[in-house]
C-alpha cells in the first residue's frame, strides 16, 4: 500500500463527517468487482493494524508518566490529610481545655497529676499520673488520686458512644490516650481517624465523629493480655507507625510524630508488663499451699469418719503441683507473642514443654485453669496454621512452602486436618497453574506445556507429601491417592477441551495422548502409577475421535467409489512415482514394485491406492491411542472401513461386462485381499499383541458380501 493512498484513507476515516454506511455504499458502487473490494479490505485491515501498533506504543511510552503522576497525587493527598489532621487537632485541644479543670478540682493538691487524658497535648501528664508502677499500683497518690483517675476516665468515656458497660468495670482507670490515624494493612491507604484510650487492662479504639465536636464512637476493645505491639519501620511518606496484632487480625496506626509514637510503644509495653505481674502474683497466691487445719484427736471427736482421712491424702497430693515457675506463669503471654510473630515452632515447643511437665501429674483447679488458657491459645494457633494452608494464601512457593504449617499441625495432633488442608492447597495450586497457561500456537505445543506443568506439580506434591507425612497414619496415603485421581480429572478436562473438543486431527490427538502417557509414566519414580486412571478418563473421548475419523474415511471412500472409472494411475513424473513407492513402503506394502509399469504407470486404481494409504494411516494413529479398553472399538472400526472397499470391488466385479476392465478389477481385488489385508492384520497384531479373528475372516473369504447380480446399486 502506497504512502499517499494510506494517508488519504486515514484522513478520510478520521474526518468528523465520516459515515460508515455511506462510505460502504459509495465503495460498492465505484468498485469494478470482488478484487477491488478485497484490495480495499486489505488496505483497511493494514491501517487498523498500524493504528493498533501506534496505540500500543503510545500507551507504553506514557505508562511510566502515568504511574509517576498517580504516585504524586497519592503523596499530595497524604500531605493534605496531614494538614487537615493538624488543624483539627488544634481545634480539639482548645475545645478540651474545660475537661482538664474537672480532675484538677477533684484532686486538690495533686491537680497536675490528675489532668491526664484531657486531650492530645497532655499525654505526658497522663503517663506520669496514671501509669502503674512495678507493683501494680499507681505511682503517686492514693485515695483522692484514685478517685480522680476514675472520674477522669468516666469523663472521657462519656464522650465515646456505645461503651456504657465499660464504665461499670471496677478498678479500671485511664493510663494514656491520644489521636491516631488508621491505615490499611495491605495497601497502606488511610482508613479513618481514631482515638485510643489505654486503660490498665485493655485498649479502647474509638472512631472520630466529624459531625459532632469532641465526640467519638466505640470501635473495638482489646484485652492487653491478647495484644502484641510491633514497631513499623519508617518508609517515607509512611512513618511514625506501629502495628497492633490481635488474632486473627492486625491494625496499623500512625502517631502525630516520632515522640508520640515512642510514648505509645513505651506505655503499651509497660502497662502490659504491669498487668502480667499483677496476674502472676494473683496466681501465685492462689497456688500457694494453705495452712493445715488444726488437728484434733480422735478421742475428742468420736463421730469423725475414717473416710475423711482417705480423702485428705489425694487433696494434699494435688496441691503439690508447682505452677510458680516463671516460664509457666508467662506461658499464655509467650504463646500470644509467638502466634503474633508467626513463630509457630516456638509456640509448639512451649506446648510440648508444658505437656511434658504436667505429664502424670494430678489436675487441681489451678492446673485446670492453666489448661483452659493454653487450650484457647492452641485453638488460635490452629486457626492461624489453617489459614496459612488456605488457598487464599499465595501459591507461588510450591509444595515446600506449606511444610512449616503442616509439620506444626502434625505436632499438635492434627494429622488428618493437615493432610486435608495440604491436599486442598495443592489442588488450588494445580488448578491455578493450569488456568494460567496461555492457549497459543499449535495444540501439541500447548499440550507439552500442560503436561509439564501438571505432572511436575504432581510429582513435587507427592515427594513433599511423602516427606511431611512419613510415619503417620496410612489413611493419609489413601487420601493422597484419592486426591491424585481428582487432580488427574482436572488435567483431563483441560486436555480434552483442547484436543478433542476442538476437533483436532487423529494424528494430532494421537501425539498429544502419547505425550500425556510419557509424562504419566514418570510418576513411577515414586511408585505412583496413574496410567489406568488416565486411560479410564480418556476412553470416552478417544472412542469418539476414532468413530469420527472412521466416518470421515468411510464417506471419503464412498465418494471415490461413486466416481470410480477403473483406470490405471498415471503419475506423469518419475518423482511422483518414487514418492508413491516410498509412501506404500511406509504403509508396509513391500511388494508394490510388481504393480508398477513403464512410463510412470501403476496397474492399480486410484481409489484402491488412496484407500490403502488412508486405512494404514488410520491404523497407525489408532495404535498410538490404543489401550485394552479400546480393543473392540478399534477392531470394529477397521472392519467397517475395509467392508466399504471390498463390497465396492465385489459389486464392480459382478456387474462389469467389459472383459478388460473386469481383469483390471480382479487385479485390484487381488491387491486388496493378498497384500493390503495381510498387512493390516499383521500390523494390528504387532500393535495389540494378539491376532484378530475378524480380520482373518475378511482375508480368507472369497466374497465378503453376496450381491444380486441383476442389481445396479451397491448397498453398504
From Swiss-Prot:
Residues 173-273 form the PH domain. Gene3D superfamilies: Exo84p, C-terminal helical domain, Exo84p, N-terminal helical domain, Pleckstrin-homology domain (PH domain)/Phosphotyrosine-binding domain (PTB). GO terms for cellular component: exocyst; growth cone; late endosome; perinuclear region of cytoplasm; plasma membrane. Residues 303-319 have a biased composition (Acidic residues). SMART domains: PH. One of its GO terms (biological process) is endosome organization. The modification Phosphothreonine is found at residue 313. The modification Phosphoserine is found at residue 15. It is found in: Cytoplasm; Cytoplasm, Perinuclear region; Cell projection, Growth cone; Cell projection. Residues 129-150, 275-319 are annotated as: Disordered. GO terms for molecular function: phosphatidylinositol binding; small GTPase binding. CDD domains: PH_RalBD_exo84 (cd01226). The exocyst complex is composed of EXOC1, EXOC2, EXOC3, EXOC4, EXOC5, EXOC6, EXOC7 and EXOC8. Interacts (via PH domain) with GTP-bound RALA and RALB. Interacts with SH3BP1; required for the localization of both SH3BP1 and the exocyst to the leading edge of migrating cells. Component of the exocyst complex involved in the docking of exocytic vesicles with fusion sites on the plasma membrane. This is Exocyst complex component 8. It comes from Mus musculus.
Amino acid at each position: 500500500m502506497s504512502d499517499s493512498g494510506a494517508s488519504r484513507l486515514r484522513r478520510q476515516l478520521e474526518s468528523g463527517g465520516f459515515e460508515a454506511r455511506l462510505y460502504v455504499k459509495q465503495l460498492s458502487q465505484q468498485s469494478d468487482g470482488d478484487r477491488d473490494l478485497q484490495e480495499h479490505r486489505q488496505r483497511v485491515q493494514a491501517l487498523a493494524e498500524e493504528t493498533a501498533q501506534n496505540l500500543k506504543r503510545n500507551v507504553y511510552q506514557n505508562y511510566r508518566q502515568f504511574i509517576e503522576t498517580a504516585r504524586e497525587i497519592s503523596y499530595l493527598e497524604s500531605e493534605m490529610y496531614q494538614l487537615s489532621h493538624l488543624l483539627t487537632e488544634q481545634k480539639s485541644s482548645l475545645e478540651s481545655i474545660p475537661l482538664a479543670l474537672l480532675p484538677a478540682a477533684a484532686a486538690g493538691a495533686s491537680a497536675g497529676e490528675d489532668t491526664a487524658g484531657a486531650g492530645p497535648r497532655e499525654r505526658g501528664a497522663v503517663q506520669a499520673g496514671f501509669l502503674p508502677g512495678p507493683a501494680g499500683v499507681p505511682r503517686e497518690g492514693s485515695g483522692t488520686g484514685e478517685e480522680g483517675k476514675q472520674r477522669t476516665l468516666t469523663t472521657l468515656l462519656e464522650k465515646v458512644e456505645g461503651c456504657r458497660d465499660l464504665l461499670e468495670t471496677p478498678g479500671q482507670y485511664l493510663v494514656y490516650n491520644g489521636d491516631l490515624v488508621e491505615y490499611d494493612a495491605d495497601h497502606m491507604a488511610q482508613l479513618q481517624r481514631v482515638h485510643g484510650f489505654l486503660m490498665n487492662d485493655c485498649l479502647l479504639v474509638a472512631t472520630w465523629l466529624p459531625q459532632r465536636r469532641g465526640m467519638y464512637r466505640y470501635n473495638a476493645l482489646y484485652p492487653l493480655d491478647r495484644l502484641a505491639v510491633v514497631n513499623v519501620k519508617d518508609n517515607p511518606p509512611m512513618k511514625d507507625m506501629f502495628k497492633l496484632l490481635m488474632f486473627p487480625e492486625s491494625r496499623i496506626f500512625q502517631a502525630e510524630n516520632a515522640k508520640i509514637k515512642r510514648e505509645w510503644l513505651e506505655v503499651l509495653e509497660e502497662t502490659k508488663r504491669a498487668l502480667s505481674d499483677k496476674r502472676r502474683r494473683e496466681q501465685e497466691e492462689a497456688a500457694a499451699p494453705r495452712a493445715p487445719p488444726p488437728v484434733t484427736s480422735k478421742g475428742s471427736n468420736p463421730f469423725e469418719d475414717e473416710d475423711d482421712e482417705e480423702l485428705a491424702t489425694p487433696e494434699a497430693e494435688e496441691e503439690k503441683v508447682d505452677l510458680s515457675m516463671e516460664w509457666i506463669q508467662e506461658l499464655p503471654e509467650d504463646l500470644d507473642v509467638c502466634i503474633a510473630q508467626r513463630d509457630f515452632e516456638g509456640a509448639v515447643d512451649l506446648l510440648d514443654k508444658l505437656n511434658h511437665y504436667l505429664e502424670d501429674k494430678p489436675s487441681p483447679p489451678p492446673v485446670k485453669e492453666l489448661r483452659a488458657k493454653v487450650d484457647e491459645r492452641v485453638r488460635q494457633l490452629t486457626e492461624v496454621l489453617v489459614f496459612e494452608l488456605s488457598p487464599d494464601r499465595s501459591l507461588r512457593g510450591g509444595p515446600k512452602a506449606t511444610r512449616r504449617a503442616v509439620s506444626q499441625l502434625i505436632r499438635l495432633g492434627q494429622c488428618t486436618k493437615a493432610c486435608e488442608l495440604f491436599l486442598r492447597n495443592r489442588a488450588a495450586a494445580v488448578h491455578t497453574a493450569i488456568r494460567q497457561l496461555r492457549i497459543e500456537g499449535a495444540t501439541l505445543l500447548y499440550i507439552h506445556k500442560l503436561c509439564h506443568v501438571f505432572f511436575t506439580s504432581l510429582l513435587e506434591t507427592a515427594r513433599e507429601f511423602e516427606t511431611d507425612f512419613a510415619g503417620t497414619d496410612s489413611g493419609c496415603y489413601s487420601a493422597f491417592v484419592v486426591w491424585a485421581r481428582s487432580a488427574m480429572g482436572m488435567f483431563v478436562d483441560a486436555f480434552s477441551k483442547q484436543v478433542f473438543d476442538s476437533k483436532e486431527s487423529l494424528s494430532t490427538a494421537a501425539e498429544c495422548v502419547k505425550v500425556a502417557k510419557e509424562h504419566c509414566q514418570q510418576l513411577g519414580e515414586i511408585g505412583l502409577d496413574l496410567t489406568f486412571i488416565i486411560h479410564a478418563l480418556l476412553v470416552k473421548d478417544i472412542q469418539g475421535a476414532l468413530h469420527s475419523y472412521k466416518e470421515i474415511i468411510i464417506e471419503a471412500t464412498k465418494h471415490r467409489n461413486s466416481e470410480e472409472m477403473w483406470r490405471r494411475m498415471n503419475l506423469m513424473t518419475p518423482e511422483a512415482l518414487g514418492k508413491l513407492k516410498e509412501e506404500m513402503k511406509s504403509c508396509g506394502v513391500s511388494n508394490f514394485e510388481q504393480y508398477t509399469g513403464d512410463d510412470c504407470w501403476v496397474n492399480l486404481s486410484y481409489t484402491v491406492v488412496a484407500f490403502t494409504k488412508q486405512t494404514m494411516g488410520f491404523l497407525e494413529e489408532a495404535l498410538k491411542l490404543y489401550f485394552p479398553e479400546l480393543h473392540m472399538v478399534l477392531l470394529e472400526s477397521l472392519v467397517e472401513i475395509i467392508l466399504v472397499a471390498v463390497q465396492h470391488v465385489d459389486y464392480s466385479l459382478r456387474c462389469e461386462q467389459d472383459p478388460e476392465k473386469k481383469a483390471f478389477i480382479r487385479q485390484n481385488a487381488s491387491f486388496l485381499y493378498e497384500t493390503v489385508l495381510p498387512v493390516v492384520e499383521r500390523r494390528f497384531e504387532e500393535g495389540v499383541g494378539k491376532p484378530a479373528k475378524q480380520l482373518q475372516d475378511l482375508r480368507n473369504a472369497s466374497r465378503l458380501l453376496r450381491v444380486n447380480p441383476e442389481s445396479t446399486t451397491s448397498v453398504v
